[in-house]
Amino acid sequence: MVISERALKAVLVAVAAYHVATGLLALVAPDTFFDDIGHYGLENSHYVGDVGAFMLAFGVAVGIAVVRPAWRAPILWLGALWYGFHAINHAFDTGEAKSEGRGWGDTLAIALGAAISAWLARVSERLSRG
C-alpha cells in the first residue's frame, strides 16, 4: 500500500505528537506514567524519566522529519528497532505488568509499533525515490 506525501506527513505529525505527549508525561510526571502506562516491576522515577527523555527526543525528531524528508527513513528505522527491542524486553516481563493479559497486550501493541514504524520507513524511502 502506497500513501501520498500529504498523508504521510499527517501520519508523521500524529506519531510525533503521541511521542512528545507521552515523553513529556514520563519526564514531568513519572509517577503518573508508571501508574497508568508503564506499571512493570518496581517503580523507579529516574528510569521512567529517562524513557520520557528518549520518547520526547524521538517525537521531536519525527516532527522535524515532517519538514525534512531526508530524516524520515533513518528516524523511522530507528523507531522500528527501538520498538522491536522494546517488544522483546516486554515479552520476557509479561508477568510484571498489572496482569498477565495486560503484559501480553502491551507486548503485542509495542510489536505493532515496530511494524508500523518499519512500514512508514519503507513508504518514506519509496516516496523519496519518486
Short names for language-model regions:
Residues A17-V48, G52:
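Hydrophobic transmembrane helix segments
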Residues T22, N44-V66, L81:
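Core segments of alpha-helical transmembrane spans in multipass integral membrane proteins
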Residues V48-A53, E100-G113:
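Individual transmembrane alpha-helices with interfacial aromatic-anchor signatures
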Residues I75-H90, A111-I116:
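Hydrophobic alpha-helical membrane segments
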Residues I88-G105:
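Membrane-helix boundary connector in multi-pass membrane proteins
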Residues L112-G130:
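Membrane-water interface at the C-terminal end of transmembrane alpha helices
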